[in-house]
UniProtKB/Swiss-Prot annotation:
Protein's name in the database: ATP synthase gamma chain
SUBUNIT field: F-type ATPases have 2 components, CF(1) - the catalytic core - and CF(0) - the membrane proton channel. CF(1) has five subunits: alpha(3), beta(3), gamma(1), delta(1), epsilon(1). CF(0) has three main subunits: a, b and c.
Gene name as annotated: atpG
Intracellular or extracellular location(s): Cell inner membrane
Topology with respect to the bilayer: Peripheral membrane protein
Record carries keyword Protein biosynthesis: no
One MF term in the entry's GO annotations: proton-transporting ATP synthase activity, rotational mechanism
CDD domains cross-referenced by the UniProt entry: F1-ATPase_gamma (cd12151)
A Pfam family matched in the record: ATP-synt
GO cellular component terms, A-Z: plasma membrane; proton-transporting ATP synthase complex
Function per UniProt: Produces ATP from ADP in the presence of a proton gradient across the membrane. The gamma chain is believed to be important in regulating ATPase activity and the flow of protons through the CF(0) complex.
Keyword set, alphabetical order: ATP synthesis, Cell inner membrane, Cell membrane, CF(1), Hydrogen ion transport, Ion transport, Membrane, Transport
Annotated InterPro entries: ATP_synth_F1_ATPase_gsu, ATP_synth_F1_gsu, ATP_synth_F1_gsu_CS
Top-level taxon of origin: Bacteria
């Protein structure tokens, strides 16, 4: 049985940990509102951009050349996985769920005879995936020093992908991130971004008004596709940021509650041990008095 000193030290240690988890929960809650607003504001813009591209694609002049960012290379040999996770941990299963989705996708492609390349955005996803795909990871992009994600961050990543695509390094690129739904629900998501996925013709027609394009649909489509890539990556980064803070807030809340339960149990053990020790000392005193 542990001594009273050991129990006091244990209780003090858990209380110190509880203060840390409570502080982290409050910080995550403060960051969550801003991150959630940014993610929710980015959604309609990204969805509208995809709808406009769908309208343009369906109205291309017959026989016009389709941009490679929409038509692809015509091959399906090399797949690039852009896996977006966090730079830090202590956010529940947020990082592992995204990495698991990417890992399963990579395994399936490998089993089908495809070549897989991986770019990790965020250190935690890299730490998980390198155990199995060390040779397939071609780059790690860290955002540790970025205080607030913005268009410039997404554009840098998009230009990286465009350069690799134009150099013929891959045929298809898939983006992995976590879509934010609520504090306790974040959905790991895979989205093909090269060649761009656009809404079906019927869906595009329902969401878009009639447009007249100048100079023509082909030129506008070619100009918008790189911007759409940046927008889709930006949306993923913002969704990830909100999901990370929601997951961390939930995880730290659970940790704080568990610490409270542990403190109660250890305090009960401490009181019982102290009571037993006092009782033992009283018995020894009484026995000594009777012996006299």
């Amino acid at each position: 049985m542990p001594s009273l000193k050991d129990l006091r030290n244990r209780i003090a240690s858990v209380k110190a940990t509880q203060k840390i988890t409570k502080a982290m929960q409050m910080v995550a809650a403060a960051k969550l509102r801003r991150a959630q607003n940014a993610a929710e504001n980015a959604r309609p813009y990204a969805e509208r951009m995809a709808a406009v591209l769908g309208n343009l694609a369906t109205n291309l002049t017959p026989g016009a050349e389709t941009p490679r960012l929409l038509s692809g290379t015509g091959a399906d040999r090399v797949h690039l996985l852009l896996v977006c996770t966090a730079e830090r941990g202590l956010c529940g299963a947020f990082n592992s769920s995204i990495a698991r989705l990417a890992r399963d996708h990579a395994r399936r492609l490998t089993a089908e005879g495809r070549t897989v390349k991986i770019i990790c955005v965020g250190k935690k996803g890299y730490d998980i995936l390198r155990r199995e795909f060390r040779d397939q990871i071609v780059e790690l992009i860290e955002l540790r020093g970025v205080r607030q994600l913005g268009f410039d961050n997404a554009e840098t990543i998009a230009q990286n992908l465009l350069g690799r695509f134009e150099a013929g390094e891959f045929d298809i690129a898939t983006l992995f991130y976590s879509r934010f739904r609520s504090v306790i629900v974040q959905i790991p998501t895979a989205q093909q971004i090269i060649p761009a996925e656009i809404p079906p013709a019927g869906e595009a027609a329902q969401t878009d008004a009639a447009y007249e394009y100048e100079p023509d649909e082909g030129e506008i489509l070619a100009a918008l596709l790189p911007k759409n890539l940046t927008v889709q990556i930006l949306r993923a980064l913002l969704e990830n940021a909100a999901s990370e803070q929601g997951a961390r807030m939930s995880a730290m809340d659970n940790a704080t509650r568990n610490a409270g339960e542990m403190i109660k149990k250890q305090t009960l053990v401490y009181n019982r041990t102290r009571q037993a020790q006092i009782t033992k000392e009283l018995i020894e005193i009484i026995s000594g008095a009777e012996a006299l």
